[in-house]
C-alpha cells in the first residue's frame, strides 16, 4: 500500500515502513485477510531483499528496502533511506502481531518463519559486541524513524526493535522444532540455515545495548543525542519551521538536539510491557520538549503514549491534530494525497490509545478511558476468529461477543471470558492526571 493510497501522486505510489507500523495493525484487527495479503507482498519480495542484503555486505539474510514499489530500493539518498535498517524489524513486528491476533499458524509455517529468520540474520551481522560498552551488542551508522538524526550509533528504537525481531525469530524456530519439524527441515535446506545460529541470536538478545542518561533517567535516541546543541525554536523564523531540509543544510540540522518525529517514544508504545509506567512518563516528558512533529507519523503516537501514562488532555490534543491533519492541511501538502498512515494512526489513537488495546504474548488487553470531550465511542475488533464490539461511555465499558464461540481478554488486568452473544460490563475508572 502506497503512502498516499490511491488518492494522489505523492511519493510516486511508493511503499514504506508506514504500512507495517501504522496501517497493518488496523487491518490485522479489522480485516485480517487483507493484512495477510500485505504480508504476502513482503514474502514475495524476499528475493530482492536478499539481493539488497548482499549489496550491503551481508552474506546471509534479507534487508528490505526503505522505499520501494517493486521490491528494490528506490531511495537514492542512503542516509535517509537504506540506513533505516529498522524496516526489517518493523516487518517482523507486524508479522508477529498478525500471528498473535489471528492464531494463523499455517502462515507461520508457510511464509512467516522464513521472513523472521532472514530478517534476524541481518541483525546478527550488522552489529558487534563492543568492549567499550562492556561487551554489549552495538549497532552503528543507522537511521531510526527520526529523519533529522541520521547515521547514528545505537539508535534506541532500532536496537529495541532489532532485539524483539531476534526474539520473535527464536520463538518461531523453537515452535517449528516442536510442532512442525518437517517445515523447519525444509527451511534449513532452503536457507542453508542451522538452529546453531540461535546461539548468537540469544546472546545478542541478552546483551543488546541501549543508551541511557543517568542524570535525566531517560533513553536518548542514540549515543550522541545528549551531546548535540539544544534546538531553540524561537530563533527560527516561522516560515522556516516546517520541513527543515528545505531551509537548512543537513549538517546544521543533525548537530542540534531535536527530533522530527516519534522515535524512542514509538518503540515504547509498541513494547510498553517492557517498561514501567514511570519510565515511559519520564521519556515522554523529555521527548515532548524536543520533538517538532514535522512528520504526519508523530502526533498519533504521542497521543497513544499520553493515554498510557494518564495525560488524557494531551492525548486528546494530539488525537485532534492527527484526525484533522488532512482536513486542515497542517503540512501544506494535501494536494499530493492523503496521509494514509496518519489516518491509520488516528484509528490507533482511539483503539490503542483511549481504549488501551494491546495484544501481548497472545493475550488481548484493554485499559479503557474516555476524553472529557466525548460522551461515548465504539468500535469492533476481530481476534482469533471472534468479533468483539466495544462501547465506552462516561461511566462504563461494555464488551459484547458478536461472532465466534468464545473469546478471552483482560480489562485492567482482570480476565474476562465471553461466549457468543454475551456482554461484559465494568465501571470506567479514570485516574487523576499525574499533571494535576
Could you tell me what each predicted segment is?
Residues 1-7, 33-93, 99, 105-110, ...:
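Helix-terminus loop motifs that line ligand-binding clefts
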Residues 2-14, 57-81, 136-155, 251, ...:
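Carbohydrate-binding/catalytic loop surfaces
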Residues 13-45, 110, 167, 174, ...:
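Active-site core of glycosidic bond-cleaving carbohydrate-active enzymes
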Residues 29, 98-111, 171-184:
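Inter-helical turn/loop segments and adjacent helix faces that build the functional surface
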Residues 122-189:
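Acidic/histidine-rich catalytic neighborhood
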Residues 340-368:
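Catalytic cores of secreted or luminal carbohydrate-active enzymes
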Residues 375-404:
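Carbohydrate-binding surface patches
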Residues 429-436:
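Conserved small/polar residues in nucleotide/adenosyl-binding loops
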Amino acid at each position: 500500500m502506497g503512502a498516499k493510497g490511491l488518492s494522489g501522486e505523492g511519493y510516486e505510489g511508493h511503499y514504506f515502513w508506514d504500512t507495517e507500523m501504522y496501517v497493518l495493525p488496523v487491518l490485522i484487527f479489522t480485516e485480517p485477510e487483507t493484512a495477510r495479503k500485505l504480508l504476502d507482498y513482503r514474502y514475495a519480495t524476499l528475493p530482492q531483499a536478499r539481493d539488497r542484503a548482499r549489496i550491503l555486505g551481508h552474506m546471509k539474510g534479507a534487508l528490505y528496502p526503505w522505499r520501494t514499489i517493486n521490491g528494490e530500493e528506490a531511495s537514492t539518498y542512503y542516509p535517509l533511506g537504506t540506513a533505516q535498517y529498522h524496516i526489517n524489524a518493523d516487518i517482523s513486528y507486524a508479522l508477529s502481531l498478525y500471528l498473535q491476533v489471528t492464531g494463523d499458524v499455517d502462515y507461520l509455517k508457510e511464509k512467516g518463519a522464513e521472513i523472521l529468520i532472514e530478517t534476524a540474520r541481518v541483525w546478527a551481522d550488522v552489529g558487534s559486541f563492543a568492549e567499550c560498552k562492556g561487551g554489549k551488542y552495538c549497532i552503528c551508522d543507522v537511521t531510526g524513524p527520526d529523519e533529522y538524526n541520521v547515521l547514528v550509533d545505537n539508535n534506541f528504537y532500532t536496537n529495541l526493535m532489532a532485539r524483539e525481531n531476534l526474539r520473535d525469530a527464536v520463538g518461531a524456530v523453537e515452535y517449528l522444532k516442536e510442532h512442525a519439524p518437517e517445515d523447519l527441515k525444509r527451511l534449513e535446506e532452503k536457507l542453508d540455515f542451522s538452529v546453531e545460529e540461535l546461539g548468537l541470536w540469544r546472546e545478542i538478545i541478552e546483551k543488546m545495548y541501549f543508551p541511557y542518561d543517568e542524570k535525566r533517567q531517560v533513553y536518548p535516541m542514540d549515543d550522541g543525542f545528549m551531546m548535540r546543541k539544544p534546538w531553540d525554536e524561537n530563533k527560527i523564523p516561522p516560515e522556516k519551521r516546517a520541513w527543515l531540509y528545505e531551509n537548512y543544510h543537513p549538517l546544521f540540522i543533525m548537530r542540534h538536539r531535536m527530533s522530527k518525529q516519534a522515535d524512542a517514544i514509538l518503540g515504547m508504545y509498541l513494547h510498553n510491557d517492557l517498561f514501567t509506567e514511570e519510565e515511559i512518563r519520564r521519556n515522554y516528558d523529555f521527548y515532548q520538549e524536543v520533538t517538532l512533529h514535522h512528520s504526519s507519523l508523530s502526533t498519533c503516537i504521542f497521543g497513544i503514549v499520553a493515554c498510557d501514562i494518564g495525560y488524557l488532555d494531551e492525548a486528546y490534543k494530539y488525537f485532534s491534530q492527527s484526525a484533522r491533519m488532512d482536513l486542515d492541511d497542517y503540512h501544506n501538502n494535501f494536494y499530493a494525497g492523503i496521509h494514509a498512515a496518519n489516518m491509520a494512526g488516528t484509528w490507533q489513537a482511539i483503539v490503542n490509545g483511549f481504549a488501551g488495546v494491546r495484544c501481548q504474548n497472545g493475550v488481548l488487553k484493554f485499559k479503557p478511558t474516555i476524553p472529557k470531550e466525548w460522551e461515548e465511542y465504539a468500535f469492533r475488533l476481530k481476534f482469533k476468529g471472534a468479533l468483539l464490539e466495544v462501547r465506552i461511555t462516561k461511566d462504563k465499558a461494555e464488551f459484547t461477543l458478536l461472532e465466534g464461540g468464545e473469546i478471552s481478554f483482560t480489562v485492567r488486568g482482570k480476565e474476562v471470558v465471553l461466549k457468543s452473544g454475551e456482554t461484559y460490563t465494568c465501571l470506567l475508572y479514570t485516574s487523576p492526571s499525574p499533571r494535576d
